[in-house]
C-alpha cells in the first residue's frame, strides 16, 4: 500500500503536478492543508483515495472542511491535520499529544513548511511544503516505511 502525503501547495499547481507525475501510482493521497483545492487541477490516478484537511489559508479563503481527522489505512491509524490548531508552527507537542490521545500510530501534518520524519510513538510525519517540491511517501506492508522526497 502506497500513501502519497503532501501539504502546503499554496497554489503551486505545477510543483504538485510534478510530484504526482513522479510517483505515478499510489493508493492514497493525503493533503494536509493549505492548497487542498489545488488537487482539482491535477489528474490523480482513478483508483486513488483522496483525503484532505483544511489548513489556516484554506479556511481564510472560505473553504469549508474538517481541520483534522482520523483514518485507518491498512490497519494503521492516521491522525491527519494541518497542525495550526495544535500550535505546530511553534511546537509539535500539541499535534503529538492529540495523536497520542486518540491512539493513532502516525500523525501526518503540515503548516511549518519544514519536513519531519521522526520514529516516535506516534510516528511524526510532515512532508514539508509541496510549493517547494517537498513531499512524503509512506509504504505500508508489515510496518510503516516513511520517506521524505523532493522534485
Labelled PLM ranges:
Residues 5-7, 28-34, 51-56, 79-82, ...:
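Active-site neighborhood of phospho(di)ester-bond hydrolases with catalytic His/Asp-centered motifs
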Residues 2-3, 17, 72-74, 97-103, ...:
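Binuclear metal-dependent phosphoesterase catalytic core
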Residues 1-47, 62-66, 140, 147-150:
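N-terminal active-site segment of His-dependent metallophosphoesterases
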Residues 38-58, 123, 131-133, 146-147:
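Zn-dependent metallo-beta-lactamase
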Residues 42, 68-70, 99, 115-117:
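Short secondary-structure boundary/capping segments
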Residues 10-14, 36-40, 57-62, 86-91, ...:
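Active-site environment of divalent metal-dependent phosphoester hydrolases
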